[in-house]
A protein has these predicted regions:
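Short, Lys/Arg-rich, polar N-terminal cytosolic tail immediately upstream
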Residues: 1-17
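A structural signal for multi-pass alpha-helical bundles of membrane permease subunits
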Residues: 18-290, 309, 313-459, 463-568
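Flexible interhelical linker loops that connect adjacent transmembrane helices
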Residues: 286-306
């Protein structure tokens, strides 16, 4: 007997195949993309060929042809920052991929999904706290270096040592993402396959880590600016200066917008080519391994697990805690022991900060931005789920082009400044509307997990309003909720570009930005006398992100974490 879903498919086919009405659902968000992404992008194509002056604007500034590119390629600084960017990125990808592969393989031996979630949540904790808090705790522990750390804070003043420390710290913070993706792939494969270790564990893990590494390669010339900025100082620019930090200094500190735009355009062109190539490579070889179909369960499936796997997992987690959480916890205990002596100094530091109003304002603002983001994601993803829809390839390429525009470029800064939004939180909220990586995650989850083989053999799979409401929406509710929680955590924990670039008024800063300014300020002893209250504040500003993590782990569907790979 045909299923209800199959009847929907047949009815759509009888009405004439795939309906281009699907594009009408995507039209409103596409218009928003054109206004807030494509229009500024046109400026990005012009700026590299002009000597931009703020008083004259883009149209009034003089054309200089290829001079900005000539100056760039003749500059020894560009060659150096390009080399640093590629080196640090590749070191991070290699270290994180190898470590995640081994950890996921070990955790995969645990048959209980509950214990898998417990262990994997531990690895995800650093990612869901603000980078400012994570780095502060690391630096505090290093400033009181003992048995847990080989390096002290003075090590960060040495260029060669920094090249070793940075990839390790970034891998520690982000390793939970590929691990949770691999575990989701393992469990998904076990639900439909009753074969052995090779097919149900090793291959899904390899494909998941391969997916992670490939997506990271598609952003080869982009680093996590905010994370890097907390560790960087002029004494280590030799190895620590990257394209992102160089552009930030060149544009916003030296007002060399044309030169900075030339760098951005080179980055964009290289990463666009890489992204298109890697997209089709992933689609061909990796998607089904990471997002296996669960429309049919294999016969004889039983939960697999082993005592040895649980023991190994326990020791791996203990080692991770020893290397990361333990020294931080020891530091917290030391600080709490001296807390009674510093209340007045901390009061002087924290007095006058708009913490309560900031929490309220940003919680409401981010919630609104996330809701808009979820609606935009649902509508943009719908045409990608319609089989044989005319023009779908061009639509896909358009989304990849916009995805690679990223955020925080000089052109976006000038766009929002021109609209009178400078020194407001509006750019911060508006840039949060767009996470096009989420669109491809929804598409991959829906097409591989929720559409049966029988439906895919029928030409002309949906695309009309009835299918959108009755079939598509119910199946994407769970992943879109998870992606929304991820977006909330990402926005809450981030200062760049929304605040570092657009905000100058301290009264409008987010709680995380307030925390950042405290630990970056030279006027206070935040690693000594004031550490007690700084750590308490760090714990407070980390709470929303941790709540989002717990919500996602309870919700399940952890393939959604692939959306975060584009942000790392």
């Amino acid at each position: 007997m045909p299923t209800k879903d199959k009847d929907l498919t047949m009815n759509t086919h009888e009405r004439g195949g795939p309906s281009i009405v699907a594009y009408l659902f995507a039209l409103p968000p596409v218009i928003i993309l054109l206004v807030y992404k494509v229009v500024p992008f046109i400026t990005a194509l012009i700026l590299p060929f002009k000597e931009y002056e703020l008083t004259k604007g883009v149209s009034g500034s003089a054309w200089v042809g290829m001079r900005n590119f000539s100056d760039l390629f003749n500059s020894p600084f560009f060659t150096k920052v390009l080399s640093n960017t590629v080196t640090l990125k590749l070191e991070y990808i290699f270290l994180c991929s190898i470590s995640a592969f081994l950890i996921a393989l070990i955790l995969g031996f645990i048959g209980s999904k509950f214990w898998q979630r417990v262990f994997s949540t531990i690895f995800l904790l650093p990612y869901f706290m603000p980078a400012a808090v994570f780095i502060y705790l690391v630096l505090y522990a290093m400033s009181n270096a003992g048995m847990f750390f080989m390096y002290s804070t003075e090590s960060l003043m040495d260029p060669e040592t920094f090249r070793l420390i940075y990839p390790i710290l970034e891998a520690i913070r982000n390793i939970g993402i590929p691990v949770i993706i691999a575990l989701a792939a393992i469990n998904g494969r076990r639900a439909v396959d009753n074969r052995g270790f090779l097919h149900t564990q090793l291959i899904p893990t390899l494909k998941s880590i391969g997916l992670f590494a490939l997506i990271q390669l598609s952003t080869l010339l982009t680093m996590d600016y905010e994370f890097l900025s907390y560790l960087q100082n002029p004494t280590i620019y030799e190895t620590a200066d990257t394209l992102d930090t160089f552009v930030y200094r060149t544009a916003l500190m030296n007002n060399e917008f044309g030169l900075a735009s030339a760098i951005w355009l080179i980055k964009y062109a290289v990463q666009l080519v890489l992204s298109i190539l890697i997209f089709f490579l992933i689609k061909r070889f990796f998607i089904k391994g990471v997002f296996p179909s669960q429309t049919k369960r294999a016969e004889g499936i039983r939960k697999r697990g082993s005592f040895v796997g649980v023991v190994l997992s326990f020791f791996v987690v203990q080692l991770y805690l020893l290397l990361t959480t333990a020294p931080l916890a020891v530091s917290v205990v030391e600080v709490f022991g001296d807390g009674s002596q510093i209340s007045q100094a901390s009061s002087d530091l924290l007095s006058g900060l708009p913490l309560h109003s900031s929490f309220t304002t940003y919680a409401i603002g981010i919630t609104f931005a996330v809701l808009v983001n979820m609606v935009i994601t649902i509508l943009l993803a719908y045409p990608l789920t319609v089989k044989d829809l005319p023009g779908r390839l061009l639509y896909t390429i358009f989304l990849i082009i916009v995805l690679n525009m990223g955020m925080g470029g000089v052109h976006e800064y000038l766009f929002f400044r021109g609209k009178g939004m400078h020194n407001t939180i509006l750019p911060y909220l508006i840039t949060g509307f767009f996470t096009l990586a989420n669109v491809f995650v929804i598409k991959a989850i829906y097409n591989t997990r929720y559409v049966s083989v029988e439906e895919r053999t029928v030409k002309g799979v949906e695309g009309d309003p009835e299918s959108f409401v009755k079939r598509y929406l119910p199946r994407v509710v769970k992943p879109i909720l998870g992606l929304g929680a991820l977006q909330f955590a990402f926005m809450w924990n981030s200062c760049y570009p929304g605040q570092l670039v657009y905000l100058a008024d301290p009264n409008k800063f987010s709680p995380v930005m307030i925390f950042r300014n405290i630990i970056m300020g030279a006027q206070a002893d935040v690693y000594g006398q004031l550490a007690f209250d700084v750590i308490k504040l760090g714990a407070a500003v980390s709470i929303p992100g941790i709540i989002m993590l717990l919500f996602i782990m309870i919700l399940g569907g952890h393939e959604i974490f692939t959306a975060q790979i584009w942000k790392n």
